[in-house]
Each structure stands twice: as C-alpha cells, then as structure tokens.
Amino acid sequence: MQIGQRLGTPLSPSATRVMLLGAGELGKEVIIALQRLGVEVIAVDRYPDAPGHQVAHRAHVIDMTDAAALRALVEAERPHLIVPEIEAIATDALAAIEAAGLAEVIPTARATQLTMNREGIRRLAAEELGLATSPYAFADSFDAFSAAVAKIGMPCVVKPVMSSSGKGQSVVRSEADVKAAWDYAMAGGRVNHGRVIVEGFIDFDYEITQLTVRAIDPATLATRTYFCEPVGHVQVAGDYVESWQPQPMSAAALQKSRDIAHKVTEALGGRGLFGVELFVRGDDVWFSEVSPRPHDTGLVTLASQRQSEFELHARAILGLPVDPTLGSPAASAVIYGGLDERGIAFEGVRDALAVPGADLRLFGKPESFVKRRMGVALATGANVDEARERAKRAAAAVRPVSSR
C-alpha cells in the first residue's frame, strides 16, 4: 500500500492499519488523530482498559518486552505501521519485524532502539554528532556508580538508562544521597535493571522541548524538517507538571536549539514527530534527551497549534503534509490522581471549564495513584503568562474523589 497517496476504509480489506505499542494518554490522542483520517488502529498495552484501548478499533494486553509475544501479535494483526509510544518494548524484536518486511516501524527500528535507552542516544548525540551535553558516565554496579559520582562531581543527576516520566531519577547533592539515589534508580528502571547514567548538573535558565517533525514536503515529495515553536516546561523529580508555548528565548538560542534538533532527528531518520529536550542558559544550549514520538510537555499543543503534536505525528507517519503553525499562546497544567484507588471520579469540572479559554482532558486511566497523571488542564491567553495562570486555575478546580 502506498500510504499517503491512498488510505483505506477501517474494518475492510482496504484498511490502512496502524499498531500503537503503548496506549496511554499520548497514544490515545494519536489514535484519535489517526481515526479522523480513516485509519484502522490496534492499541497494545501492558494493562487492560488503558486510555488508548478505549478508543481503538481493537485492543490487546501483552508484555511488550516479550519478543515472542510481540512478534506473534504483529503476525496476527499484520499492521502496515508499528508506532512505539513507550520505552518498555522488545526493540530487538521490532528490528527483526522490520527486517522481515512484516511492518514498518516508526520512525525506524534503529531509532527506536537508540532512543529507548539513554546510553544509546547520549552516545549518538555527544560522541557521534558532537552535540553539547552535560558531562556523563554510565555505571552498572554500586561501586562503579560511586566512582562515576566522584568523577562527575556533585550535584549530579542520576537516571536509569531505561525509564520514563522521571521514574528512578534523583539529584545527588552530597555523599549522604549516593546510596539512596542508586536504590531509587534500581527500583525505577523499566527494563535493563542495573545500569544508570550519571549526568553533571547544568545550571540552566530554563528547559524547553523543541517539537520537531520529519514529514513530506508536498512540493518535492522529499522528507523535510519542520519545527514547532519552543515549549517551555517545569519538571518536578523529572516529571512534567506544567508547560507553555511559546517559550520566550533569544534568537541565537532558538537557532541553536533547532540546529541541535535537526542534527539529532536527521541522524535517527524516518518520519514522525520527535520531542527534543534541551537546557538553555542565555544563548547557550545543551542537548538532554529525545523521544521519537509525541512528548508529554507537548500536550499544550492541543490548545496552541493549528495541528496538535498528535495530528502532526499522525500526518507525518502517513506521508501527509503537516502545518506546525502556532495559533495562540497556551499552557497546560497536570491534574494528579491525589489518591490510590480504581475508578475514581472528578468534581469541579464545571468550575474548571468556566475559566476563560480553558479546556480539559481527563485521560480515563482505570486506576489512580497519588502522583499519577490523570488529566491535564489547557488554556489559551493573550500571552503565555495569562495562559499559564488560567491553566493552573482550571487544574486546581478539578478535585479527584473516591467513587466508593
């Protein structure tokens, strides 16, 4: 099938089939964007009734780190495209699936392998591409970790080489923190337990996500790189709590950010949207990480852009033209679960939506935890400051409550 020139009808022999590996809140929005273009979507996750399961044509629950189970599901469903949305996947199996011609992996199987592992992407960025990064070292034992901390110096940031949403991430500020940081990283890694990256601490002014799209240029039919306006964000313990767009920054810093994003995404190749995380101080910019898929901080684009990051990703992977134009300054603020319980309810929704320019996304996760992201408030404004105030006010109005 020549995807882009021709799209089929879902649930028919002509269907264009896309399988998402990971069906959380970001995957859910990608599924909705794909379905608006008439794509048949298969959602896969490790637990039942995930947000994306609730809107997909078909849903499956498997251990995606089980290579045999993943291969069997792909052979049964025969998707045209496989779109990884999380880190905990048997990436070697994806490479074998792509090599066998069973499906195309987005953006590529190699890109998925590199970016699911902080070691792979850091070595690519710093050692192959020569991009500015913080000093770093890797360790796979406590003794090696202690030596790495001594080499990098304190304060330093410790992360499992494979984790998401800040899991296992901490800052070592003194010798008293070293053992606790190692133990926390060991508990937080999804796969590849036992290996961490130790990063030197950069005294940055702010962090941004440079959403970068590799998509078709309709004039030439060649792959072209497009940039969204920079997304500013606040993270607590490595997990995003607030984001806004556009982030004010100097012309020099913006150009450096886009140069870095272009180099790393071009090296990864393929089609789709990438979230490139960067540290900025004045006109200086450092590469941090890259995700080859929509980024949690990019939820703000549901309110800010003509096409959200999810629509951009859907169009790009299907070989369709994209438009990353900013429509309005906007912001997002996270709504946490606040309690440990299945099937919670939300009060204050009417009050939240009464905030001028505000909107909500309640993700529909079947189980809440105190610090689990259960929704997000969005808001537009005349400027970023107004949008941030509105988004935070709307988020604060929503009260997760027990349904018992």
Swiss-Prot record:
Annotated InterPro entries: ATP-grasp, ATP-grasp_carboxylate-amine, ATP_grasp_subdomain_1, PreATP-grasp_dom_sf, PurT, PurT/PurK_preATP-grasp, PurT_C, Rudment_hybrid_motif
UniProt domain ATP-grasp: residue ranges: 123-318
Residues that, per the record, bind N(1)-(5-phospho-beta-D-ribosyl)glycinamide: E25, L26, E85, D296, K365, R372, R373
GO annotation (BP), single: 'de novo' IMP biosynthetic process
EC top class, as a word: ligase
Residues engaged in binding Mg(2+): E277, E289
Pfam family name, one: PurT_C
Protein name: Formate-dependent phosphoribosylglycinamide formyltransferase
GO terms for cellular component: cytosol
Gene behind the chain: purT
EC number: 6.3.1.21
Function: Involved in the de novo purine biosynthesis. Catalyzes the transfer of formate to 5-phospho-ribosyl-glycinamide (GAR), producing 5-phospho-ribosyl-N-formylglycinamide (FGAR). Formate is provided by PurU via hydrolysis of 10-formyl-tetrahydrofolate.
Keyword Metal-binding: yes
Recorded superkingdom: Bacteria
SUPFAM superfamilies documented for this protein: Glutathione synthetase ATP-binding domain-like, PreATP-grasp domain, Rudiment single hybrid motif
Sample GO molecular function, one term: ATP binding
Family: Belongs to the PurK/PurT family.
Reaction catalysed by this enzyme: N(1)-(5-phospho-beta-D-ribosyl)glycinamide + formate + ATP = N(2)-formyl-N(1)-(5-phospho-beta-D-ribosyl)glycinamide + ADP + phosphate + H(+)
Pathway as given in its UniProt record: Purine metabolism; IMP biosynthesis via de novo pathway; N(2)-formyl-N(1)-(5-phospho-D-ribosyl)glycinamide from N(1)-(5-phospho-D-ribosyl)glycinamide (formate route): step 1/1
Keyword Nucleotide-binding: yes
List of residues binding ATP: R118, K159, S164, S165, G166, K167, G168, Q169, E199, G200, F201, I202, E207
